């Protein structure tokens, strides 16, 4: 079974290795991130994909990004390594690649204790990235970037809260904005994991797409930077009766479980990341790169990055139109109408990538409810 993606043709037999054509967006993001990183560092870079499958992500990077000094590809499945070697030869990138048929953590740890570390690591597991983050942080160069995926959406979104607590040391929240809570729990766990090694992990671009969460973040050293990042951890509370949400800053802060608006008991999520999940400058660099080099081939990536850039500096949650219409028992207005009306009232609102009927706003809930009632 041969496929074409980007500038690469490759073999991915479904019975031997896992390959998901729907994850092209995730791989597109990796290409652009690595391309920008190579320009920022202004030196040949070393990359690693320890859970490579058929190797498509790294082979695409080698074909589509200049200035790659070396790529380390690993997989514990010997059949996968055979297919990776076939795909490397097929795409004529052999001189830049080393392949290893070993456990992902063993591969990462072998570089963590060596002088040569990675500028970019990509962790793309089936399930949770938790088992691999610690050694990934240890094997990254200072100013390096870590990209990772989580597909264990059910625990992170609150369907299996005990699993989420075991895995991420955080309580999830089943709510209309569960997807954002899931993303923020994942980032928060990465921040805390890095902090144990006096490393700061700061998200530069992160998103939720269909069945997975994707996070890219940069690392740096220094206790002050770590402590500053830890200040961006906190909690989100939610009243299911009156729909009010609240962001509580500080992992050490006390949570008031009584809703100040209706006196009902509030639910909560956390600890989680309450800072920005993307950097505006990095989003713009990605858009510039797409416009200069990729145009129509990256149309979905471009659309999502534009939405992500718009979401920056808004509260750490979103609203969904059918949630509010159900509460007031009236049909929902169109999203464009909601945003226009909020903007008229000297607040601001933007659509969110999390949900086609969702929006982020700095307007109080009372203002939103009034707009829906007057529609």
What are these model-predicted stretches?
Residues 1-375:
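SAM-dependent transferase fold signal centered on methyltransferase-like domains
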